[in-house]
Swiss-Prot record:
Keywords annotated in UniProt: ATP-binding, DNA damage, DNA repair, DNA-binding, Exonuclease, Helicase, Hydrolase, Isomerase, Nuclease, Nucleotide-binding
Function: The heterodimer acts as both an ATP-dependent DNA helicase and an ATP-dependent, dual-direction single-stranded exonuclease. Recognizes the chi site generating a DNA molecule suitable for the initiation of homologous recombination. The AddA nuclease domain is required for chi fragment generation; this subunit has the helicase and 3' -> 5' nuclease activities.
MF terms (GO), sorted A to Z: 3'-5' DNA helicase activity; 3'-5' exonuclease activity; ATP binding; ATP hydrolysis activity; double-stranded DNA binding
Gene: addA
EC number: 3.1.-.-, 5.6.2.4
GO CC annotations on file: cytosol; DNA helicase complex
Name used for this protein in its record: ATP-dependent helicase/nuclease subunit A
Cysteines engaged in disulfide bonds, as pairs: none
Family (UniProt): Belongs to the helicase family. AddA subfamily.
Length: 1236
């Protein structure tokens, strides 16, 4: 059935001839529209070679390519002959099409045009982050050492900079500042120019601080906005007080407050810094009536009015008020003092820029000397290539259209690069600025926002197309999202006004009887005065309570139903664990979360529970490597001895220590080994491994450790053994990749691993197969682009991360750089005025991104959202803070809540509260409100959503027990009865009903069972038959008359068997890289490598028919394998249980038989949820009887492929299976087999 597009979707598919920005909100069918646009252009005769399609992750690029392939194949079925040939050609061109990340495209440009910029074509991409970081650290060491030299011209300035950030013995903070500054510059097309202009601080040079651009553009707008909000609240309070004679004193107080605010407001514009500072400091000292004042104490309405006025007064003039905080920070010093500090800081910035440029230059030189190019180089070098006019015209002429997916995540350098590739009117940009959540990667959402405004102007030739219809979420999810963001997100905070066309429009088709669910659970934590250690314990208990609440809610959902809109036909069904996702801001606490859910019997799937390097099996291997590198390290040596690898007890370790108390532990072990053979064996092993390390063969070293200690086998027997083995194999792979790229030794590898740990690289445990019936746990970042029927959002009360707002140096793309200045004589550190302004800009930027993360989290849900947070309702300070937020939000007029109110939020929970303050929520109003009716919401906000709020005590939350595990009390009879003896006799006389099955193997391989489906070797092997007396012959299924002669009894002249050649051919096909174009030369090289590695013997290798393999690779099926190379699985082992009577014709028992085997290969198409398996055959086919022999092979192997298919169907029950393909290499044919 053809997709029915909306008017705007159709515009997005068809419109052309100019630049187009498609603003595609969550769930609007963006990818479907993009693919349809591409397929329509292809059908019009434009080749895929003429598109440049870029996105921001390899996974997204892969998905785009796969979807386009499916779309072309779909059109191919109904195409006429001419179009069919063209579409088939497009399928062949698709693997090489320009569908990639921007970095990958830049790399392709460099590989093709390296000569334009004089780059050595033999360069290698430095893709390993840890390796790059190590190289940068080495360069920093060299450059810093040069600057520390007293003869260096910048030495004195450098020392002043070092002392400002720390001291010569502790310059880590300065090193990090240099790297951070360099990273910022590398993400800009004008990076070097930007660096040079950083020391232009107009606060230091302006004729008066209030005349500086920084004041006019940053400090003044901030102060004006805050004063306007305070003035509005004060005036509203004064209005409420008018006509109330009992509160005359309070009225007079607010007259003074308003006069003060108006006076300061004017002074901000008119006065110089010192005059303004003086006026700000003259806070009015006012007093109000008290609760016991005459005529008030017995009047509830007057008491409520007085309480409101008191709160407002404290919010304006109180010691902890926002205004008082601004005065104490920004206006701490007079103009002379501030400008002195700014001038000193400017000199430090100048030195910092010089140092950074020196490090950048040295790093570039080091990379070129080593023939390396890193990821930041890619964009810069590609841009340098495109600065050549002739090259730019050549490149630009290749593309009819440039399509940019996820355009909101682009940075300035990437934008400049793509603009140069375009012809000025063929850019097609798709994205949603509301989902720009990659600021830490230098993403620049303002680029999208700028075009969003400009492309909507009537005189602009380019166009903006809005896709606001949401086809994902049930109406209540969409309406709650709109309720929240029409009050929170505007151009100042969020980079787009969430109004009009930017709002979501509910368009998903759900039955009217689907219950709308937006559940907000607030866990009340008792307020207990605690020490710092107890605070940590209380924080842990808070998380545990939330996780337990999640478990309870998830278990309660098992008895409910959801609407499955993707089923055929769509309809209601019970909730499954796979319908549920838990989204978090970070991975902190994942170990506890998973443990809690598993304790409740809830299966989970999580990308990464913890740091890979902290797993026991890997950590121990790293200690072994440290000891091999340097055995005189007591802690690693003691650790490996005490570990299961060597099994020393505490007493053993003590005995070793007593053997030599004066020297290190290795010396003691050496002495102890003279009388202890086990210790001598350990020493011999370490020395053996050390010799391997000297040879710089990391791969052989790690495998030798595995082999000599059986460590791989040991961990397999531990809980989670498969995962532990996967982790160790991953370590082996890290070592192999590192060795291939660097050829460095063990010491550098250990340092490389430590660099990964220091950088908190968050290497997750080695991935296992996905469990589709498990609760998914992931970060909000990882959930982007996904959708789930039910979404849980725990820890909504968790404070925003403010780490980027602190530190000795702050950088913001527009505000520049701000330092903390250390006064050298007094050794007093203070933030400069510039740093304070940068901090404000950074906070606005950070809070904007947090707001967009909240939007992404809410819009992942299809039907139900559960929010969980914890508050200390009994803690007066926190309670008063939340009440103040609620009251201010209630009193806000207009569409959006006040900017400073939104900025004062500390968590998502705060934002959720203030967005509900003007709605009629009795539960929250009874907690935070004062009984006054809420103000009317803005015209863009509607009250058509349903939100349920409930409070529970932390002490009432318990982790549920898994169902079915109840402990039953067992009682024992005190005397034997007659029936006990009858039962005993029945047991003794018991006849096993599956006696026949005991004479068949309960563990069968498919190769042993092939005979049952016409085995090809049946003429050479005896088969198991039922004897004439009906008894089964107790033997293996297939037995040979003769045993193969061992090698030492042969003269070596025996010709390799056809089976050996077939096995060798299978090995080559197993290792073949389907992502690369294969030639006779490359296949021969692969065969020869296998001989060199000892995996094939030369006589066998000589008989492998390379031409047969090449002929197969030319088949259409082989091309499909190339297109699905990423999802290709080869040599896949399986095991399954089958009833014996389904396997053996003469056995009638239903006893279970374990069948195991190895499937040559299969590939998965995740888009269509389909699987195609295949099997290689090297059987001889007679030239004159090809069809006859193929027919026999189809019959012969049908049973075998049936078993393979059944095994995969058990593993992938929800997937469609196409006919298995029998690949007959002898004639280069691929035959589909109809299975039973």
């Amino acid at each position: 059935m053809a997709t029915r597009f909306t008017i705007n979707q159709q515009r997005a598919v068809e419109e052309t001839g100019h630049n187009i920005l498609v603003a595609a909100s969550a769930g609007s069918g963006k990818t479907t529209v993009l693919i349809e646009r591409l397929i329509q252009k292809i059908l019009s005769g434009i080749s895929v070679e003429n598109f440049l399609i870029v996105t921001f992750t390899n996974a997204a690029a892969k998905e785009m390519r796969e979807r386009l392939e499916i779309a072309i194949e779909k059109r191919l079925r109904d195409a006429n002959d001419g179009m069919k040939r063209f579409l088939q050609e497009q399928l062949l061109l698709l693997p090489a099409a320009n569908i990639s990340t921007i970095d990958a495209y830049a790399l392709r440009l460099i590989e093709n045009y390296y000569h334009v910029i004089g780059l050595d074509p033999q360069f290698r991409l430095l893709s390993d982050t840890a390796e790059r970081d190590m190289m940068r650290q080495d360069v920093l060491d060299t450059v810093f050492e040069a600057f520390y030299d007293e003869t260096h011209p910048q030495h004195e300035n450098f020392i002043a900079l070092v002392n400002n950030f720390g001291n010569p013995n502790q310059d880590d903070a300065l090193r990090q500042a240099v790297l951070k500054l360099s990273d910022f510059a590398e993400a800009r097309p004008d990076g070097q120019q930007w660096l040079k202009e950083l020391d232009k601080n107009d606060l230091a040079t302006a004729n008066g601080l209030t005349q500086s651009q920084t004041y006019r553009l940053t400090i003044l707008p901030m102060m004006i906005a805050r004063l306007e909000q305070l003035l509005e609240i004060a005036q509203a309070t004064q209005t409420n007080l008018s006509g109330v004679p009992e509160l005359k004193k309070t009225q007079q107080a607010f007259d003074e407050i308003i006069a003060y605010l108006v006076n300061v407001q004017q002074a901000l514009v008119d006065d110089d810094w010192d005059t303004l500072r003086g006026k700000l400091s003259q806070l009015p000292k006012v007093s109000l009536e008290t609760k016991r004042s005459k005529g008030i104490k017995d009047e509830p309405e007057l008491l409520a009015l007085l309480a409101q006025a008191t709160t407002v007064k404290n919010n304006i003039l109180g010691a902890k008020s926002d205004l008082k905080n601004v005065i104490d920070t920004f206006f701490k010093f007079d103009q002379n003092d501030w400008q002195y500090v700014e001038k000193q800081a400017t000199e430090l910035v100048n030195t910092l820029v010089t140092l950074t440029q020196a490090c950048q230059s040295a790093f570039t030189t080091a990379k070129r000397d080593a023939q390396l190019v890193d990821f930041p180089d890619l964009g810069a070098l590609a841009l340098e290539i495109l600065n050549d006019d002739m090259t730019r015209k050549t490149v630009s002429g290749q593309f009819q259209e440039i399509l940019v997916d996820e355009y909101q995540d682009i940075n300035q350098l990437q934008e400049t690069l793509l603009t140069k590739v375009s012809n000025g009117h063929n850019m097609y940009m798709v994205g949603d600025v509301k989902q720009s959540i990659y600021g830490f990667r230098q993403a620049e959402p303002t680029l999208f926002a700028r075009k969003y405004r400009q492309f909507a102007l009537p005189d602009n030739p380019d166009s903006r197309i809005e896709l606001a219809d949401n086809f994902r979420s049930q109406n209540n999810v969409t309406r709650v999202t709109n309720l929240i963001f029409t009050q929170l997100m505007d151009e100042k905070l969020g980079d787009i006004a969430y109004t009009g066309e930017a709002k979501l429009v509910p368009k998903a088709n759900y039955p009217t009887d689907v219950t709308p669910v937006f559940n907000m659970t607030i866990i009340k934590q008792p307020n207990v005065t605690t020490s710092e250690d107890e605070d940590e314990s209380q924080e842990f208990e808070k998380r545990q309570a939330q996780y337990a609440q999640l478990a309870n809610q998830i278990l309660s959902l098992r008895d409910t139903t959801i609407f499955d809109r993707k089923a055929e036909p769509a309809g209601m069904r019970p909730v499954q664990y796979g319908d549920i996702a838990i989204l978090t801001r970070s991975k902190t606490g994942y170990i506890d979360l998973v443990a809690t859910l598993r304790q409740a019997g809830i299966p989970t799937q999580v990308d990464s529970v913890g740091n890979y390097f902290q797993t026991m099996e890997v950590y121990l291997m790293l200690d072994v490597l440290r000891v091999i590198d340097n055995p005189h390290q007591d802690i690693p040596l003691a650790a490996i001895l005490r570990s299961p690898m060597f099994g020393y007890s505490e007493n053993d370790l003590a005995a070793v220590r007593l053997a030599d108390k004066k020297h290190d532990y290795w010396s003691a072990l050496t002495v102890f080994a003279q009388a202890d053979q086990r210790s001598q064996t350990v020493i011999d092993l370490i020395k053996k491994w050390h010799q391997l390390a000297i040879q710089n063969d990391l791969v052989a070293l790690i495998w030798a450790i595995f082999d000599d200690t059986s460590w791989l086998d040991y961990v397999a027997g531990m809980p989670g053994g498969a995962q532990r083995q996967a982790n160790l194999h991953a370590l082996y792979d890290y070592a192999r990749t590192y060795q291939e790229n660097t050829h460095a030794g063990l010491f550098r590898f250990i340092r490389y691993i430590e660099q990964l740990q220091e950088n908190d690289g968050q290497l997750g445990e080695a991935p296992q197969e996905a469990n589709e019936q498990a609760v998914r746990i992931m970060t909000i970042h990882a959930s982007k682009g996904l959708e789930f029927p039910i979404v849980f959002l725990p820890e909504f009360d968790k404070s925003f991360n403010t780490q980027d707002l602190s530190g000795k140096m702050l950088i913001q793309k527009n505000a520049g750089i701000g330092l903390e200045y250390l006064q050298p004589e007094a050794l007093v550190a203070m933030p400069t005025l510039k740093k304070l302004t940068v901090q404000q800009a950074l906070k606005r930027q950070s809070w904007s991104e947090e707001m967009r993360l909240l939007y992404v989290a809410l819009t992942r849900a299809e039907q139900q959202i559960y929010v969980v947070g914890t508050v200390k309702l009994d803690e007066n300070e926190e309670n008063q803070r939340l009440i103040a937020l609620w009251q201010r939000a209630k009193e806000t007029s207009g569409q959006f809540l006040a900017e400073d109110l939104r900025l004062s939020a500390k968590s998502y929970f705060d934002w959720l509260l203030i967005s509900l303050a003007r709605t009629k929520n009795d539960d929250l109003e009874s907690w935070l409100g004062d009984g006054h009716l809420p103000h009317v919401l803005g015209p863009e906000t509607t009250l058509d959503s349903q939100i349920s709020v409930r409070f529970i005590n932390e002490s009432d939350v318990v982790i549920p027990e898994p169902q079915g595990n109840e402990t039953k009390e067992i009682t024992r009879a005190s005397t034997y009865q007659a029936e006990d003896f009858a039962r005993a006799k029945a047991i003794l006389d018991y006849q096993y009903p599956f006696q026949q099955a005991t004479r068949t193997a309960a563990y069968q391989s498919v190769s042993e069972m092939k005979r049952l489906f016409e085995d090809p070797d049946r003429a050479n092997l005896k088969t198991l038959n039922v004897l004439e007396n009906g008894q089964l012959q107790p033997a293996n299924e297939l037995v040979s008359d003769k045993l193969v002669l061992p090698t030492f009894m042969t003269d070596g002249s025996q010709k390799p068997s056809s089976a050996a050649v077939g096995t060798a051919t299978h090995l080559m096909l197993q290792l073949l890289d389907f992502k690369q174009i294969q030639t006779h030369q490359s296949l021969t090289a692969l065969r020869d490598d296998l001989v060199t590695q000892g995996r094939l013997t030369a006589p066998v290798a000589a008989l492998i028919d390379i031409d047969q393999i090449l002929n197969f690779l030319q088949t259409p099926f082989a091309q499909r394998l190339c297109l699905h190379a990423d999802s290709l699985r080869r040599e896949a082992t399986f095991a399954m249980i089958m009833p014996a009577n389904q396997i053996y014709e003469h056995v009638h028992d239903q006893a279970s038989v374990l069948v195991h085997g190895i499937i040559d290969g299969y590939f998965i198409d995740k888009k269509t949820k389909s699987i195609t398996l295949f099997d290689y055959k090297t059987d001889f086919v007679r030239h004159g009887r090809v069809e006859e022999d193929i027919s026999k092979m189809m019959v012969r192997y049908r049973g075998q492929l049936t078993l393979y298919k059944q095994a995969l169907m058990q593993e992938f029950p929800d997937y469609t299976f196409y006919e298995p393909q029998l690949i007959i290499l002898n004639v280069g044919r691929v035959i589909p087999i109809t299975t039973k």
